[in-house]
Regions:
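Juxtadomain coupling helices with adjacent low-complexity linkers
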Residues: 112-176
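Sensory/regulatory domains in signal-transduction proteins
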Residues: 2-137
Length: 176
């Protein structure tokens, strides 16, 4: 669950066009096996240097670890994950996206990788999620190790979703 530390983040925000789709496929370890032009354009990467790289090359440090734990736990169960993700472009800029990530299966039903489609997110939802993620990050920073950080951050996310009376996926879909 490492973050992209080789790029210096900036305050430059990129906005996805309403009809833009960012599509990637990864193997079981999260290494990119396919990236569409939309992904390459918004992340400011080229295909040659992107394929086989870990998908976390676009991970923004403002993303709580607990969100990625939830993502991986959901996918490993064979379930579909929805999330609002702040990604980082190769120049340090960022963009918010509504992500739908699903397992990919072979003919025998075995998970062989993951398929991600991201699109522009609702601004109202981004503002809510931004505040929630900031609270989660603060909780993570107060812990002495990743395990405790994820537990503290997950509790905040769980408490928020319990207040809403729905799961994380259901909450996000309600804004779609």
């Amino acid at each position: 669950m490492s973050r992209n530390t080789s790029v210096i983040q900036t305050s430059k925000e990129y906005t996805l066009k309403t009809n833009a789709l960012i599509v990637t496929k990864t193997d079981l370890k999260g290494h990119i096996t396919y990236a569409n032009e939309g992904f390459l354009n918004i992340s400011l990467l080229d295909e040659k240097n992107t394929l086989t790289q870990s998908h976390n090359i676009i991970r923004h440090p403002d993303m709580p670890k607990a969100v990625f734990r939830l993502l991986w736990d959901t996918l490993k169960k064979g379930d579909e994950f929805f999330g609002v993700i702040k990604n980082m472009s190769s120049d340090g800029g960022y963009y918010w996206a509504f992500a739908n990530i699903t397992p990919s299966y072979d003919n025998s039903g075995k998970i062989i990788g993951y398929f991600s489609v991201q699109r522009a997110s609702n601004n109202e939802l981004i503002n809510i999620i931004k505040n929630l993620y900031q609270e989660m990050l603060q909780a993570e920073k107060q812990q002495s190790n990743d395990k405790l950080a994820i537990e503290a951050s997950s509790k905040i996310l769980t408490d928020f979703m319990n207040e809403q009376g729905v799961s994380y996926n259901e909450y996000l879909i309600s804004f779609a």
